[in-house]
Amino acid sequence: MKKITFIGTGYVGLVSGAAISDFGHRVICADISKEKIRQLNNGSVPIYEPGLTELLKKNISAGRLNFTYDIKKAIRDSEIIFIAVGTPEGKDGKSDITAVKSVAKVIGENINEYKVICTKSTVPVGTGNLIKSIIKEHNFNNVPFDYVSNPEFLREGSAVKDFLWPDRIVIGSENKKSLNIMKEVYDPLYINDKPILSTSIATAEMIKYAANAFLALKISYINEVANLCETLGADVQDLSLIHISEPTRRIE
């Protein structure tokens, strides 16, 4: 059983934190918003996702899942820290990683023993190096740590199912120590015989963007097919069932 903190209680942080606590780990979900933490502690879930409310209640009752706005203490009390804050698109079309950088600074200032720092947020390739440098800059006692990237592949409407029954888990790491620690986090998924795919940090960061781009490509494809069907008098519903029902062509 690991002691884990998720910084950020938005869509990714809340779903991931609840699901990982269901694996048997002790999880703290931390956020700077006192109001959001108050609501969560009172049983109010700020987002709707099928199965999430039940998952939260189950693990809160079991004592495995807690919420706090004391991010500094949550960092000190954990072995693994997941960065799960938002990275919204800015006016220039680029991801705004201001919150990620702020979290890295707080981690550096409060790291008190060896920890694994893991990014769940979708971040541009190369952000891992920036996070490491910020932590080191503020880690005045030179406490050792490892950094890993563990991108999420959650779909709205089936996020809980996607996390508990994934088709793969991607971990980007720099050494076996941090990789093995992350494998222990996902140990229960071995029961489902799901592969843990190990790669470099940069590749893990890129995989998320590649997956998003491929999804956009598939959606564009079926839209073009639908337009052709309308022009030619073909039935796009039947076509979808026949042609895209084959797993390698499925729109997901």
Which residue stretches match the model-derived regions?
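Rossmann-like NAD(P)(H) cofactor-binding subdomain of soluble oxidoreductases
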Residues: 88-153
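NAD(P)+-binding Rossmann beta1-loop-alpha1 motif at the extreme N-terminus of oxidoreductases
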Residues: 1-44
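A structured beta-alpha segment of the ubiquitous adenosine-cofactor-binding alpha/beta core
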Residues: 52-79, 89, 108
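A short helix-to-beta-strand connector/capping loop
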Residues: 56-66, 141-145, 192-194
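Single conserved hydrophobic/aromatic residue that forms the stacking wall/gate
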Residues: 242-252
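Glycine-rich, N-terminal phosphate-binding loop of Rossmann-like dinucleotide-binding domains
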Residues: 83-85, 121, 173-174
